[in-house]
């Protein structure tokens, strides 16, 4: 990991989907840069043993009341909010226990990945604006910007449009908030070693196939995505808004 330098000192950051994968990597990276970090997930994330000033809340990002309660608590306890990372997400493989109900899987993936990003952003904006502005970073995917064969009847077809929606929502929100001191960008990772891809990479043949999609010959790591999130959260990206930063080992360059 890059040596910390206090790039987020004095900032309050909320990260959803913080229990594992990219979200967890973000809370670790932001905390190392001296941010006050609020870790949020459907079940209260465990932050014991992590360095820095961290707190955690259970929150359902598909429920407005749940989100508003967390943001009100953040405002009361920390006096503001500057950075939001919308990392909460599901795939068809973990959206529902019943993997045969394709229609419900579609609804659930869209609800968490797209509606959750919308609701969390919507309820965060007033607090970020009151705090003097800041940044929203949304987690999209390369699947949101290129076509990828998923199979119409297996439920996986919901994931790309959910992430494509995040890309377009990011652009729309960025334009809406540009004159209010809030920058909005999204990250589009390729395949990354997280719980969302664990069931795929456990099979050697599939794992090698996925690695082969990337010219660099490997999958991404959560900390590599967190480093990009840090850049977009920091003042180093002060003239960047409405952008989709692709982090994919060359996958979309082919």
Language-model-derived ranges and their functions:
Residues 121-122, 171:
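A short, exposed helix-loop element centered on a Lys and neighboring polar residues
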Residues 167, 186, 208-236, 240, ...:
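C-terminal helical subdomain
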């Amino acid at each position: 990991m890059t040596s910390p330098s206090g790039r987020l000192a004095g900032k309050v950051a909320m990260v959803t989907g913080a229990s594992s994968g990219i979200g967890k990597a973000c809370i670790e990276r932001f905390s190392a840069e001296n941010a006050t970090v609020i870790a949020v997930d459907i079940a209260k994330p465990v932050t014991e043993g992590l360095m820095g000033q961290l707190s955690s809340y259970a929150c359902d990002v598909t429920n407005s009341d749940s989100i508003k309660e967390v943001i009100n608590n953040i405002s009361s306890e920390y006096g503001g909010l500057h950075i939001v990372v919308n990392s909460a997400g599901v795939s068809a493989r973990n959206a529902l226990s019943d993997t045969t109900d394709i229609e419900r899987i579609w609804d659930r993936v869209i609800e968490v990945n797209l509606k959750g990003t919308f609701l969390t952003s919507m309820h965060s904006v007033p607090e970020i604006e009151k705090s003097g502005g800041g940044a929203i970073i949304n987690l999209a995917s390369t699947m949101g910007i290129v076509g990828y064969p998923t199979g119409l009847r297996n439920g996986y077809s919901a994931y790309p449009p959910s992430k494509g929606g995040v890309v377009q929502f990011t652009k729309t929100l960025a334009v809406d908030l540009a004159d209010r001191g809030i920058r909005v960008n999204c990250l589009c990772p390729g395949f990354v070693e997280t719980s969302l891809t664990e069931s795929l990479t456990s099979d050697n043949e599939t794992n090698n196939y996925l690695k082969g999609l990337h010219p660099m010959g490997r999958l991404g790591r959560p900390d590599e995505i967190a480093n990009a999130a840090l850049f977009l959260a920091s003042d180093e990206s002060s003239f960047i808004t409405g952008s989709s930063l692709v982090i994919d080992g060359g996958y979309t360059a082919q």
